[in-house]
């Protein structure tokens, strides 16, 4: 989906400097706001959105937008409508349908302009918000889970191949920056050995009832552990807790009951 373009060393150094800086404004989820603001300036756009999405469970575990709330009113109706039409949008569902999270994509990679304007996603979300152009970068976050960085523009020129090439070169550094941010957060939210036992079992796909049997406790106790875990990790769902606690997917290989054995 890319064609050869020239990216200046100065542009690349600037972007790498943005991602590589150790920043103090680390939010409860996502990337530092100052980092996102500088990315928006370097790849000119009207708005930028960075969020984590679980397509299997139809949830987001965080969402950052610059300007804040530009294209998302946060309503349950809007969120439900998004998922109703999500899989019909070739451009939006491409990473989940194909497993390709490396490509930097735009809607016009998949549609003609006329076709794009006739889609439900454009009609229900893009057009009402004044969005004509989008460019998307994805990072893997587990099965059917992606972290997405979206750049938006209104009427005018689409994103260029230079813009796409810059994001392609930036992508591995952004991925490392996001992992580093997750590690920094996890170190500030201490969990007990029992909390880690529960989290490993949740990550393995066990229900509360199965976890209760495995740990020889009641389901009510498991629920209480999860409440405490959510509070310490500053999240509100199982998916978000797993993503926060295991930013590199380490839960898939870590021994579930290691804490008890020690």
Regions found by a protein language model. Name each.
Residues 236-249:
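Short, basic, alpha-helical segments at the C-terminal edge of helix-turn-helix-like DNA-binding modules
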Residues 44, 175, 179-185, 234, ...:
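Two-component transmitter module helix at the DHp-CA junction of histidine kinases
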Residues 157, 166-184, 208:
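Signal-transmission/dimerization alpha-helices at domain junctions
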Residues 4-10, 17-156, 162, 172:
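Regulatory input/activation interfaces that engage signals or partners
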Residues 185-227, 231-232, 247-262:
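Helix-turn-helix DNA-binding segment
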């Amino acid at each position: 989906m890319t064609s050869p373009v020239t990216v200046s060393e100065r542009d690349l150094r600037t972007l790498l400097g943005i991602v590589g800086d150790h920043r103090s404004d680390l939010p409860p989820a996502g990337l530092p706001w100052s980092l996102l603001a500088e990315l928006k300036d370097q790849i000119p756009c009207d708005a930028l959105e960075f969020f984590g999405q679980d397509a299997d469970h139809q949830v987001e575990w965080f969402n950052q937008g610059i300007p804040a709330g530009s294209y998302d009113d946060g309503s349950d109706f809007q969120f439900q409508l998004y998922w109703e039409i999500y899989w019909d949008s070739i451009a939006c569902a491409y990473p989940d349908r194909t497993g390709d999270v490396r490509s930097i994509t735009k809607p016009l990679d998949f549609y003609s302009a006329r076709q794009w304007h006739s889609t439900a996603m454009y009609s229900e979300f893009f057009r009402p918000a004044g969005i004509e152009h989008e460019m998307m970068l994805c990072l893997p976050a587990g099965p059917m889970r992606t972290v997405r960085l979206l750049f938006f523009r209104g009427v005018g020129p689409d994103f260029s191949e230079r813009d796409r090439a810059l994001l392609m070169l930036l992508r591995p550094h952004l991925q490392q920056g996001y992992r580093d941010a997750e590690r920094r957060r996890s170190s500030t939210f201490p969990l007990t050995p029992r909390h880690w036992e529960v989290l490993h079992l949740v990550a393995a796909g066990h229900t509360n009832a199965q976890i209760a049997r495995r740990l020889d406790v009641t389901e009510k106790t498991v629920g209480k552990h999860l409440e405490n875990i959510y509070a310490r990790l500053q999240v509100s769902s199982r998916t978000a807790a797993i993503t926060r606690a295991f930013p590199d997917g380490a839960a898939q290989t870590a021994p579930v009951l290691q804490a008890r054995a020690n």
